[in-house]
Every structure is written in structure tokens, then in C-alpha cells.
């Protein structure tokens, strides 16, 4: 295995990522790890659905996903301020909103003021009608989406064996219903934009809908730059604040780097049993 030569870290004012869905088979942890190891932001905003508590299984947490967590901790130790914005898939963390430990805090939103430009950052589920009135339907949809990604992986294995290109079933389905999805997204965007304009923010940043975007939205009272950080399930996108503006970036392996130690096979997973967890806790209690 060839090891890529390390490149200089990209120094940024801020980075926003969302919808990583750690703890599920949908998460593209290796790519996310590579991206995080390529940047050095002053602020890292984890904009919701970072850990997928809805679908989390204690028997499944791949090493690659564990390394993502370790990398975020390492970034905090090196001075990056990390703010965890709670989403719907990790809503159990809402009871801890307001908690701050060192460079880490759990919040419902972030208002980031860089050089006088205010960014209003929140997950976006607050403006999701399904989440407000039919949470069971949202959870059912999440389960179906997870099942689809598993089927997708199996299909891609067979396609690879026959030398065919990989496909994304969920992306194809989105294209089939593009007009309907565009209507839903537009309503979501307009709601966010109207409030942002009213509050006089320059930028409004969400996640939640797995639909990366950067666009101006106007109404009779003004305009705002609407951004969506996308996800790390299909789109592999992030938002970077540099040179007094936000950029929507797509993961490119050539712009990142991994060492041999970081490269982890998707099938290489860490099975965490209750017994192992108890033993670890017991050792921690007894250690100096």
C-alpha cells in the first residue's frame, strides 16, 4: 500500500460538517477522516446528526469511525474550538445543551461572527414539518434509508466483480423525484432565509436535508446567503470559511492525505460487548 506524502494543513477560520451518521454503515468514515486530517480550522462546527443515536448499535462501531472521533479530540487539543450542534438523529444530547468542557461545547445553534459577518448555524430539523408532527414517520424513513444503503453496498460488490461502475441507489431515487424534492427543499430554504433576513444575518447555514447548497435567497426585506453543509453519506461535503466567505467543498482524495495506519478496511469493525465495556470501566476506576 502506497502512503501519500503529507501535505500542509489547510488553515481556515471555520469548518462546518453535518450528517456524518457515525454508528451506522452509511457513514463514509475513511473519507471523513481524510478530510479532517487535511484541515486546521479555528472553529469546527459539527452541525447535527453526527452520531446517529436513532440507529446506533453498540455492536457496530468500525475503527475508521472511532478514528474520526479521535481526530476531532486531537483537533480540540491543538486549539480548535469544537461546537456540537444537536440534530434530530442525536436529539438525546439535547439534555446536555449548555455543557462546555475545554474547547468542546454542546449547543442548539451557533452564531459565528468573523470580521463582522454573522453566520447563523443550526441543524434545520426545527423547520421540518415531518419532525414536528410525525417523528415516527421520520424514524421509519431513516430505517428505510439505512436498509437501502446496505443493499447498495451489496449491489456495488457484485458490480465491482464484473468490472462495472458503482452506483448510488438513493441518489438515483432522489433524481427520480427531483421535482418534488426541489419543492420541499425550496420551502425549507425559504423559511430559513426569511428568518435569517429578519434577524439580519449575512449567512444562514443548515444541514439535515442532505442537500448541499450555496445560493442567495431574496425577499422584499433583503437577501441572505443560504448554505447547506450536505452530508458524509453520499455527497461528502463541508463548508469552509476562508477569505471572508463560505465555500462549499466536495471531498477530493487528492487534496487530503492518509497514512497506512489510518487506512482501515470497511469490514474491519470493532465489536464492543457489555463485558468489554465493563472491563474498561473497571480498569479506569482503578487506574491512578
Regions found by a protein language model. Give the residues of each.
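Conserved beta-sheet core of the metallophosphoesterase superfamily
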Residues: 102-109, 125, 129-139, 182, ...
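Non-catalytic terminal accessory segments
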Residues: 106, 115, 169-202, 211-212, ...
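Hydrophobic/aromatic beta-strand patches that form the interior of the parallel beta-sheet core
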Residues: 15, 45, 83-85, 120, ...
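Active-site-proximal beta-strand elements of phosphoester/diester hydrolases
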Residues: 13-21, 118-125, 225-230
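Core catalytic region of metal-dependent phosphoesterases/phosphodiesterases
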Residues: 5-13, 22-114
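Active-site glycine-centered loops adjacent to acidic/histidine catalytic or metal-binding residues
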Residues: 19, 48-49, 87, 123, ...
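Active-site-proximal loop/helix segment associated with metal-binding centers of metalloenzymes
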Residues: 124-188
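Binuclear metal-dependent phosphoesterase catalytic core
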Residues: 112-115, 217-288
Amino acid at each position: 500500500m502506497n502512503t501519500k506524502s503529507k501535505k500542509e494543513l489547510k488553515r481556515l477560520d471555520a469548518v462546518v460538517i453535518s450528517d456524518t451518521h457515525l454508528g451506522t454503515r452509511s457513514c463514509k468514515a475513511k473519507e471523513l477522516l481524510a478530510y479532517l486530517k487535511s484541515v486546521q480550522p479555528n472553529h469546527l462546527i459539527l452541525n447535527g446528526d453526527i452520531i446517529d443515536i436513532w440507529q446506533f448499535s453498540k455492536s457496530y462501531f468500525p475503527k475508521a469511525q472511532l478514528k474520526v472521533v479521535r481526530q476531532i479530540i486531537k483537533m480540540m487539543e491543538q486549539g480548535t474550538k469544537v461546537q456540537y450542534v444537536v440534530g434530530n438523529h442525536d436529539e438525546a444530547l439535547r439534555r446536555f445543551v449548555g455543557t462546555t468542557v475545554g474547547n468542546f461545547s454542546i449547543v442548539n445553534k451557533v452564531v459565528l461572527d468573523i470580521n463582522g459577518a454573522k453566520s447563523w448555524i443550526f441543524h434545520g430539523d426545527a423547520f421540518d414539518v415531518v419532525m414536528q408532527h410525525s417523528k415516527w414517520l421520520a424514524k421509519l424513513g431513516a430505517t428505510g434509508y439505512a436498509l437501502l444503503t446496505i443493499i447498495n453496498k451489496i449491489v456495488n460488490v457484485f458490480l465491482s466483480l464484473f468490472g462495472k461502475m458503482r452506483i448510488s441507489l438513493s441518489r438515483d431515487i432522489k433524481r427520480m423525484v427531483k421535482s418534488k424534492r426541489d419543492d420541499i427543499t425550496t420551502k425549507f430554504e425559504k423559511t430559513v432565509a426569511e428568518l435569517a433576513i429578519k434577524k439580519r444575518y449575512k449567512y444562514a447555514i443548515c444541514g439535515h436535508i442532505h442537500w448541499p447548497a450555496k445560493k442567495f435567497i431574496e425577499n422584499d426585506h433583503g437577501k441572505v446567503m443560504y448554505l447547506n453543509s450536505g452530508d458524509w453519506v453520499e455527497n461528502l461535503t463541508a463548508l469552509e470559511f476562508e477569505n471572508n466567505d463560505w465555500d462549499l467543498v466536495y471531498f477530493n482524495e487528492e487534496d487530503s492525505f492518509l497514512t497506512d495506519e489510518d487506512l482501515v478496511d470497511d469490514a474491519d469493525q470493532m465489536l464492543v460487548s457489555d463485558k468489554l465495556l465493563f472491563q474498561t470501566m473497571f480498569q479506569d476506576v482503578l487506574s491512578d
